[in-house]
């Protein structure tokens, strides 16, 4: 009702504060879709306040992620997901949540690697120059589950056992 009242007034800006929080999951998905469609059709600047990262990621062109009243990072949803500027941002954005490993930057066979307990991970080429300054130091390595792929035994860098699979219809967690 409140959104309908705002629409008929032809505002220049919408401020929507925790609008979908009280809706069940199915209705929230439907209303989120409709709100995005209406906002796009009207071309009205919309400031949407939410604690739900799914709402933020799916509805926003630009996100300002805040913690305790301070801006932690701002940018497009993809910027925050792919290039978080802090552990807080990396942990907040993405489902399932990013995996964090405490590792030491070491040199093995002339290349840099992350030593995470018994696990040894190659430092990606695009991070080698940056990681030089951390050689011998501990860092936190973030691994997004969506970026991991299965490889035949003996060909991957990480060996493990799948403990649980959550089917989502078109994918799995």
At which residue positions do the language-model features occur?
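ABC transporter nucleotide-binding domain
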Residues: 77-109
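ABC ATPase nucleotide-binding domains
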Residues: 1-88
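Short, P/G- and charge-enriched loop/turn segments at secondary-structure junctions
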Residues: 4, 90, 127-130
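Non-catalytic connector elements of ABC transporters
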Residues: 96-100, 107-173
